[in-house]
A protein has these predicted regions:
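Catalytic pocket-lining loop regions of alpha/beta-barrel enzymes
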Residues: 136-252
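Acidic-and-aromatic substrate-binding clefts and catalytic sites of carbohydrate-active enzymes
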Residues: 42-45, 67-74, 95-103, 128, ...
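Short, electropositive alpha-helical surface patch
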Residues: 78-87, 176-185, 238-244, 267-276
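Active-site gating/metal-coordination segments in enzymes
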Residues: 70-167, 174, 218-222
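Divalent metal-dependent hydrolysis catalytic cores, especially in the metallo-beta-lactamase
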Residues: 29-44, 49-71, 88-94, 116-123, ...
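Hydrophobic faces of well-ordered beta-strands that scaffold small-molecule active sites
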Residues: 3-7, 63-66, 90-93, 116-120, ...
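Mid-to-C-terminal alpha-helical segments outside catalytic/metal-binding sites
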Residues: 1-5, 14-57, 62, 240-241, ...
């Protein structure tokens, strides 16, 4: 079996759910604005049904739909919809933990069938969430003070997915050390690019996280992060370093599809792992299936 731990899909724009993210959307629709990433090779409305069809062609059994911020970033309607509608899809949503009703929002969305956790876009300015990346922002440290929210997340078994840029890993370390009972997933292995070699500072920070058994690292976004063509050989020693530090039980493959569709096929987002010569078949089975299910309690 194979689970894609990081995929995206989204519904059409409407009055209730307008497309508003200027970095993603475009066209003349009444509810859309900005410049769509025309490089995508998938349909502009890439629904759960289309994702499932692509999964079937790749023989991916299940996928985690990470909320796609094409609408206002806290609008989780479509992620919840597909998680409730399809047994093969689960969902990760985004909530403003600083909102007055944040706990109520969390309790409501976690009650939906198939929702397994929340995502923090710690690499984005809070007022430009998912519209711009900025390695200098530090609102994650302010989020530490939202104690009631994180207590609710722990009570609800909400896995906390954190997307961050390498210079912000010290914030992630402080956050995790403050709330050691939560379950954590580090998206895109903290966006470490292929030209950064193991031993550099980002890897030292990740090594600190490896000491926490409740932290899993996603081996996702590799097509974007690599400076080379398939099979992305500059990322191979990153895989081996993660394997050594975290063990295969805490590394999980994710495609970041269809964000990668401008440079790779869905198949290539997975099969590059077969070219990491030192990985055993058992390692691959853990990384592409067992590790994530075990980590978030899906097994």
């Amino acid at each position: 079996m194979v689970i894609d731990t990081h995929a995206h899909c989204w519904g059409p724009p409407s009055e209730a759910h307008p497309w508003t993210n200027s970095q993603i959307v475009g066209g003349s629709d009444e509810y859309a604005s900005g410049d769509f990433l025309q490089d995508f090779t998938v349909d502009l409305v890439y629904t759960g049904e289309k994702l499932l069809a692509d999964m079937d062609r790749l023989v991916v059994e299940d996928a985690v739909v990470v909320g796609y911020p094409i609408c206002p970033w806290t609008d989780n309607w479509y992620t919840v919809k597909v998680a409730e509608e399809y047994d093969r899809l689960t969902g990760v949503v985004m909530i403003d933990q600083f909102a007055d009703d944040a706990v109520d929002q969390l309790e409501d969305v976690m009650s939906a069938e198939g929702i397994i956790g929340i995502r923090l876009g710690a690499g984005c300015p809070y007022d430009r969430m998912w519209q711009r990346f900025d390695p200098t922002v530090d609102w994650l440290l302010d989020a530490i003070d939202e104690t009631e929210f994180w207590a609710a997340a722990e009570a609800l078994d909400a896995a906390v997915h954190i997307w961050t840029l390498p210079p912000q890993l010290d914030q992630v370390v402080e956050f995790i050390e403050t709330y050691p009972e939560l379950t954590y997933v580090i998206d895109h292995h903290s966006y470490i690019r292929g030209d950064v070699r193991p031993g550099a500072e980002p890897f030292e920070q990740l090594a600190t996280l490896a000491a926490h058994d409740n932290v899993l690292v996603k081996l996702s976004g590799v097509v974007t992060l690599s400076d080379e063509e398939y099979p992305y050989s500059d990322k191979h020693d990153h895989v081996l370093w993660l394997l050594d530090q975290f063990g295969r039980e805490r590394i999980a493959w994710g495609s970041d599809w269809p964000n990668e569709s401008n440079d790779a096929t869905y198949l290539e987002t997975l099969t590059w792992l077969n070219h990491v010569d030192e990985l055993s078949q058992s390692d691959l089975e853990w990384i592409t299936d067992r590790s994530f299910r075990q980590h978030v309690g899906m097994d």
